[in-house]
């Protein structure tokens, strides 16, 4: 089983995938790759279900870090939206030992996503002197956790006081849940402020918009992945937004996965794409607020889909938008865009941007 699962999970790392998200160009090879990625992720889910049981499938996503170890019998799940860390195991022998090891490694892991394979059970998590979760979690004495000794003591406390078990009819699942500090989102955002400011100055994109996109896309999870193979903090797709940005910078090919998992490179690429949407694809929209609404929606669903809401002719679409008030443009995009996800996306990003502007 382990060999079969490993083969299914390694393959996504060897193919180049993209999605209609963040781009409109139809590409047959892209469609084949995307379908293949979906199939492999379906196999992943199916095999996890075989190991863990019905309704126990947990997979890494844009706002969920999930790492399996111990022949897929132990997993660490960080929900960056809810602010919870759940460590679980179905190990039949010494489950507490498996949990303890996973708790310590999760609390002390670094922030280099390129060094961790979320699609295998390889225990490639290294203990960092600067843990990614430092300050986002405190122990039972209210102290942040930087060193292995404190992490070990906290793990012992959790196993003694918060260990839970449940049966799903197939397995006994042992678990421990840790709540992150209330302002965990702000603490993660703070890690990337320098990179955001640099990209903002470089491309002329408002810092508040970059931060709002990052919050909406990944909740500032540098390990963010998606079933459409969007990667990193700003969920950049290699063969659409990534390729467009590289072309505009005179580079050939597409950014690698490791490149997009590097926070600075991801923020730079995502911000460059926002600038392209603003200055090139949607540059015919005169009012800056109306154009911002269009750019936000296009970051999710593509510039072409935004313009087609108003007219199938791109020039005519921009002309129509230019006769409308920004409020009417917002109302139209949040009610008439064909994608429900894109309609919600504009609302979420616009709301988040307002909060960052007030800071």
Swiss-Prot record:
- Localization: Cell outer membrane
Listed EC numbers? 4.2.2.n1
Q: Which GO terms describe its molecular function?
A: hydrolase activity, acting on glycosyl bonds; peptidoglycan lytic transglycosylase activity
Provide the lipid-modification sites (S-diacylglycerol cysteine). 17
The record's listing under CDD domains reads: LT_MltC_MltE
Report whether Nuclease shows up as a keyword of the record. Answer: no
Domain of life assignment: Bacteria
The UniProt keyword set, sorted, is: Cell outer membrane, Cell wall biogenesis/degradation, Lipoprotein, Lyase, Membrane, Palmitate, Signal
**InterPro entries registered for this protein in UniProt:** Lysozyme-like_dom_sf, Murein_transglycosylaseC, Murein_transglycosylaseC_N, Transglyc_AS, Transglycosylase_SLT_dom_1
Q: Which GO terms describe its biological process?
A: cell wall macromolecule catabolic process; cell wall organization; peptidoglycan metabolic process
Q: Which segment of the chain is annotated as a signal peptide?
A: 1-16
- Entries under Gene3D superfamilies matching the protein: 1.10.530.10
Query: An example Gene Ontology cellular component term from the record?
Result: cell outer membrane
According to UniProt, the reaction catalysed is: Exolytic cleavage of the (1->4)-beta-glycosidic linkage between N-acetylmuramic acid (MurNAc) and N-acetylglucosamine (GlcNAc) residues in peptidoglycan, from either the reducing or the non-reducing ends of the peptidoglycan chains, with concomitant formation of a 1,6-anhydrobond in the MurNAc residue
Lipid-binding residues (covalent, N-palmitoyl cysteine): 17
SUPFAM superfamilies attached to this UniProt entry: Lysozyme-like
Q: How is it placed in the membrane, per its record?
A: Lipid-anchor
**PROSITE patterns, per database record:** PROKAR_LIPOPROTEIN (PS51257), TRANSGLYCOSYLASE (PS00922)
PANTHER family per UniProt: MEMBRANE-BOUND LYTIC MUREIN TRANSGLYCOSYLASE C, SOLUBLE LYTIC MUREIN TRANSGLYCOSYLASE-RELATED
Primary role: Murein-degrading enzyme. May play a role in recycling of muropeptides during cell elongation and/or cell division.
Family of the protein in this entry: Belongs to the transglycosylase Slt family.
Which named protein is this? Membrane-bound lytic murein transglycosylase C
- State the organism of origin: Escherichia coli (strain SE11)
Tell me the classification of the organism that encodes this protein. Answer: Bacteria, Pseudomonadati, Pseudomonadota, Gammaproteobacteria, Enterobacterales
């Amino acid at each position: 089983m382990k060999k079969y699962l490993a083969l299914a999970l390694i393959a996504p790392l060897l193919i180049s995938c993209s999605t209609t998200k963040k781009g409109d160009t139809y590409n047959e090879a892209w469609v084949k790759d995307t379908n293949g990625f979906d199939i492999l992720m379906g196999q992943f889910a199916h095999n996890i279900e075989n190991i863990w049981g019905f309704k126990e499938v947990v997979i890494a996503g844009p706002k969920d870090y999930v790492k399996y170890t111990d022949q897929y019998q132990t997993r660490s799940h960080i929900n960056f939206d809810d602010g919870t860390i759940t460590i679980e195991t179905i190990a039949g022998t010494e489950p507490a030992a498996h949990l303890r090891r996973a708790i310590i490694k999760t609390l002390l892991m670094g922030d280099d996503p390129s060094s961790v394979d979320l699609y295998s059970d390889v225990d490639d998590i290294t203990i960092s002197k600067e843990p990614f979760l430092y300050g986002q979690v405190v122990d039972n004495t209210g102290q942040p956790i930087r060193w292995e000794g404190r992490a070990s003591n906290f793990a012992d406390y959790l196993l003694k006081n918060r260990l839970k078990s449940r049966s799903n009819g197939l397995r006994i699942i042992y678990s421990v849940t840790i709540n992150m500090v209330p302002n965990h989102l702000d603490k993660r955002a703070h890690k990337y402020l320098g990179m955001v400011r640099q990209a903002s100055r470089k491309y002329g994109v408002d810092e508040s918009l970059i931060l709002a996109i990052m919050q909406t896309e990944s909740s500032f999870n540098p390990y963010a992945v998606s079933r459409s193979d969007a990667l990193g903090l700003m969920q950049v797709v290699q063969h659409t937004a990534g390729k467009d940005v590289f072309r505009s910078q005179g580079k050939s090919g597409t950014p690698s996965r490791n490149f997009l998992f590097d926070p600075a490179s991801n923020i730079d690429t995502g911000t460059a794409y926002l600038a392209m949407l603003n200055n090139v694809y949607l540059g015919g929209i005169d009012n800056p607020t109306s154009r911002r609404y269009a750019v936000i929606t296009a970051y999710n669903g593509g510039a072409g889909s935004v313009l087609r809401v108003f007219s199938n002719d791109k020039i005519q679409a921009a002309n129509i938008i230019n006769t409308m008030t920004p409020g009417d443009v917002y109302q139209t995009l949040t009610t008439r865009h064909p994608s429900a996800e894109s309609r919600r996306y504009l609302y979420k990003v616009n709301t988040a941007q307002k909060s960052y502007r007030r800071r």
